[in-house]
Each structure stands twice: as structure tokens, then as C-alpha cells.
């Protein structure tokens, strides 16, 4: 009986330590941008951070504001315009925002532009830069897609991609993301890396820009 109590106490302590560690990682991301989950070449790291910095310049932009209109203008003026469709102020605009960031950085050769998330996922697949392995550890500058209607199903998320953001950084089990059209603004999201509604990642080939 004595040993069972000791084991129970040790288990509780381990759980508490794990919880506190996760809380620490979460707070770290709230106060900063996080880290690269693995080492990448310096030139690639610089390019990834340039994309993230460009996205962060729009942080706080409210829907239907002047800045929102400017984001859509960047997207709509790009040629070729995906689907030949100009995004309106009343449209969902997360993919248009993520595309506009790439356009502003002259990275459309490695980031396919689209105003629809599921179509953009298809474009990543077409160029062989789509990743949906749950073990993948994202890097700053990766594009993260969600299927919010997947209803927390266990196993591989295969639902319809209906939202997208750009990875800012990681810490422990969490990812920090910047997103357009999050609660009708450009804002951060901190999400568990193994969240069941993460559809997958579009991976810009930053390395090819340094060859």
C-alpha cells in the first residue's frame, strides 16, 4: 500500500511537471515568435523569416478596414489571378492574405497563389510540396491548413481545407501561426502540433532560392 501511494505521488508529480512545461511553452510563444524546430541553412532561415516579417506587418488589420483593402489589392493585382476572381471585402480572405504575403515578397515561384484553401492545397500537391504526415515539425514560413469541419476525428485529417495561416515558430508541442481572417482580423494563433484538425502543410521550397 505504501508503495502504491509513492507511485501515485510520483505519477501526479510527473503529470504536473508536464502540464507546467506545456504552460511554459505556451506562454513563451505568447510573448515571442518561437524557434526553428530544426536547423536550416542560414540563407534559407533568412528567407523564411522575411516572409514571416512581411506577414507580421499586417498584424491587427481589421476586416473591412483600409489595410484589409490593401491586402486584397495586392492579391487582386497579381497576374495570373487565380480563377480570374477578384476577392471582395465580404469574402473569406485567409488564403488571399497568405498569398498576398508571398506576392509582396516576390516568392510566387515557390508559393502558389489562391483565394481558396482547398484549391491551394491541390496546387501544393501538384508541385510536390504538400506534407500531411503528423510527425512533421513545421518551420517558420511554412503554410498550415486546417479542416475545422473534421470534428476532431482521430487519425489522419482528410477533411476539406477551410482555413490557412503562416507558421511563425514553434516551442515544445505548440505552433505559433499568423492568419488573415482569424476572428475577422490578422492575428496570431497558438495551436497544439498534433491538433486533429490540422489538415497539413504547404512547404515553400526556400532552399531552391539559394542555389
Label the model's feature ranges.
Residues 3-9, 13, 19-40, 45, ...:
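Aromatic- and glycine-rich peptidoglycan recognition patches
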Residues 27-105:
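N-terminal capping segments
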Residues 75-79, 127-129, 134, 186, ...:
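Solvent-exposed, flexible loop/coil residues
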Residues 84, 92, 96, 100, ...:
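Surface-exposed loop/turn and secondary-structure junction residues enriched for glycine/proline
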